[in-house]
Amino acid sequence: MSKVQSITRESWILSTFPEWGSWLNEEIEQEQVAPGTFAMWWLGCTGIWLKSEGGTNVCVDFWCGTGKQSHGNPLMKTGHQMQRMAGVKKLQPNLRTTPFVLDPFAIRQIDAVLATHDHNDHIDVNVAAAVMQNCADDVPFIGPQTCVDLWVGWGVPKERCIVVKPGDVVKVKDIEIHALDAFDRTALITLPADQKAAGVLPDGMDVRAVNYLFKTPGGNLYHSGDSHYSNYYAKHGNEHQIDVALGSYGENPRGITDKMTSADILRMAESLNTKVVIPFHHDIWSNFQADPQEIRVLWEMKKDRLKYGFKPFIWQVGGKFTWPLDKDNFEYHYPRGFDDCFTIEPDLPFKSFL
């Protein structure tokens, strides 16, 4: 059989997916976090891998799914939160635009799996399966009640799950995880299709979503999940020291308010008294595509007049950020390589060839 005859759609998928293979898994495992620092990697959407100076590994909102894949059904699912929000009927054209940079089934060293809320792009059955199958049998799954309900429904033992609500603190080795109030109003209208939201007081946010503050020996990280802007960010900033804050940013389509704008991101950072603010979530959905440079432009316009005490950082999916080593950087660039040029003699026809 010739090579072209032996190749199938399945063999093509297995040879190219996930796009980064185990490259990032290996990078994270090999990373030695220096004392007085923490390292984190952006996994896409609001997915974050955090590693402390003590070698503690936790992942938050790691999602391995995708968006729309077919024009087959031109209508939105009845009762979808976006339909409730804007009274729309047409299918939402939200295609995933970000590659898969971490292989969940190549994960071996992990100390906790966390989710901020139960929306499909923030909690993942494949991650749960991979951790259950390949990692230590005491790795906890931490999240609000709706997330724990999902995990247990997928087959994660109830005793492996920890339900958190605002005010709760969970210690995972040298990382202290504080569950804080979430401000994700979209979560409150994510309801069963037959349940009406109009004229009904929403149930509590606390069972549906939380924000997290990760206190590590090398600094503190604030993860806001899918939260919108809220005045209560200032309360969190008053009560906690925050070094780096992550905020869900995007260009909201007409009739929709689901992501923070550039102005919201700056207000969040100012309210939290953070040193660095990093937008995320803008990478993942084609119909919420936004340019994070807008945040920096607006910051440049306002920083001197408003005496901002923080800087924005523009990240790339799969990239690493180390606090405090990267605190004065404005943008991430993937490693460019070739730092060992002329280690050996070039093999060129003559010196001036290039």
Curated annotation (Swiss-Prot):
The enzyme's E.C. designation: 3.1.1.-
Gene Ontology CC terms, in alphabetical order: cytoplasm
Chief place where the protein resides: cytoplasm
Any Gene Ontology biological process: L-ascorbic acid catabolic process
The keyword Transferase is annotated on this UniProt entry: no
The keyword Ligase is annotated on this UniProt entry: no
Leading EC class: hydrolase
Catalysed transformations (reactions): L-ascorbate 6-phosphate + H2O = 3-dehydro-L-gulonate 6-phosphate
Annotated keywords: Cytoplasm, Hydrolase
Known pathway: Cofactor degradation; L-ascorbate degradation; D-xylulose 5-phosphate from L-ascorbate: step 1/4
InterPro entries membership: L-ascorbate_6P_UlaG, Metallo-B-lactamas, RibonucZ/Hydroxyglut_hydro, UlaG-like_MBL-fold, UPF0173_UPF0282_UlaG_hydrolase
Cofactor(s) named in the record: a divalent metal cation
Pfam short name (any one): Lactamase_B_2
Induction and repression of expression: Induced by L-ascorbate. Repressed by UlaR.
Job of this protein: Probably catalyzes the hydrolysis of L-ascorbate-6-P into 3-keto-L-gulonate-6-P. Is essential for L-ascorbate utilization under anaerobic conditions.
HAMAP family in alphabetical order: UlaG (MF_01266)
Family: Belongs to the UlaG family.
Name this polypeptide is given: Probable L-ascorbate-6-phosphate lactonase UlaG
Organism: Salmonella typhimurium (strain LT2 / SGSC1412 / ATCC 700720)
